[in-house]
Amino acid sequence: VRITAKKVGLRTDASSKFEKGLDPNLALEAVNRAVQLVELLEAGEVVPGVVDEYPNKREPWQLSYNPAWINKFLGTSISEEEMQKIFEKIELKVDPVNHIVTIPTFRPDLEAQADLAEEIARFYGYNKIEATLASGTPTVGKRTYAQSITALVKDTVIANGLCEAMTYSFESPKVFDKLLIPADSDLRKAIVISNPLGEDFSIMRTVSFNGILTSLATNYNRRNESAGLFEVAKVYIPKALPLTELPHEIPTLTMGMYGNMDFYDLKGIVEHLMHVLGMSKVAEYVTEKALPWMHPGRTASVIVNGESIGYLGEVHPAVLKNYGIGTRAYLAVLDMEKVIANANRDVVYQALPKFPALTRDIAMLVKEDVTVKEIADIIKKNGGAYLEEAKLFDVYQGAQIEAGYKSVAYSITFRSAEKTLADADIADAMDKILKGLAEELGAQLRDK
């Protein structure tokens, strides 16, 4: 009633009377009064008993109040005794010890402590309440740690030349077939939307890269020679179906590219990201063959502190065909929850080296299935105390290289914090490195 009266701008006695609601318990009193008048005027015969269709009778209810809160809320200093008198004036029963009032059924508008405060102000007098300026303690607005890391990730990826994308969280069930996801995969157990716009938006996504691949396909079909996109968005993994609780929402960084960028460009971005987040020394890249939408021989898992936080590599040719992308494309997917958990933003400063480094380059023949990680691990294991860095600078297969083999070249840097190193200081370490490579990987040192 009050809302309607306000909308039409019409204030009447009826609106004032009925806007607070009517007490259904007054019906019996009205009937009794009518019967009394019938009997008084001898207009009929009164019979005993009442027929009442009233299954859910409204009973008085109780509200607790806090005098200190009411005074703070109103900006007053009214005593508890005065509050009690005001409550009694409006026919509320008061328990002053426990600060509880019993609300009669004819006051349905009193539902909360703020309503009681309004009644106090009405009887106390609005003109007695002194005007005061709002006061409070300002707080410094800032991002949470997770928000800061996410913002840093976005800035870093943008600085590496990728453009941020925003894709739909709703997808079609046909996406799973396009991505070659097996029929028994848990990724197919998606949340179904009860009122979808259509089949193409009928489930919540359980994988993050369909939107990126679709966007890459759009760019390719519009004859863009190259494209690099990324998105930080959530995937929705139900804990059980049908839903009994909220799903696990996993924020995920997805990067995709094609054209004048390849696997090594993508790996470079991931490595830069690991460096910025303080994880470069604990990040490893291990061959990954269990992802059906990725090329089995050109995909690597990103391992940090012994735990996989994502993967990167080339998209499976069959998937590219399903999306209408006629060239090689590359994806990197990182679990942002794990990235945030492993990020280390503590900066450690150290003095610039006082003594020059000593560098040795080695080139070796190894079988083509030997990974550079295996080679790097052996170099680090046998490099000794002076080893500073082992950097891959060349991988070659082709003319003058036997079939089934590849040439791998490393630049190995040694440095001491106490002196200038001589050849004799690193001779033992180099011998151990070469011996380890030969014995464990069958590596053959190349002279030229």
Task: Name every feature range the model reports, one short phrase each.
Residues 89-92, 239-243, 248-249, 254, ...:
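A carboxyl-terminal module marker
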Residues 18-26, 71, 105-109, 197-201, ...:
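A generic structural motif
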Residues 63-225, 360, 413-415, 425-448:
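Extended, well-folded interaction surfaces typified by the phenylalanyl-tRNA synthetase beta subunit core
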Residues 1-58, 200, 218-223, 228:
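Mobile "lid/hinge" segments at catalytic clefts and subdomain interfaces of large enzymes
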Residues 38-53, 95-97, 164-168, 222-229, ...:
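Flexible, glycine/charged-enriched surface loops at secondary-structure junctions
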Residues 1-18, 56, 61-64, 124-138, ...:
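Residues forming anionic-ligand binding surfaces in small-molecule and nucleic-acid pockets
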Residues 6-17, 84-87, 91-93, 286-294:
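Non-catalytic beta-strand/loop surface segments
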Residues 1, 108-109, 137-139, 172-178, ...:
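Flexible loop/turn segments at secondary-structure boundaries
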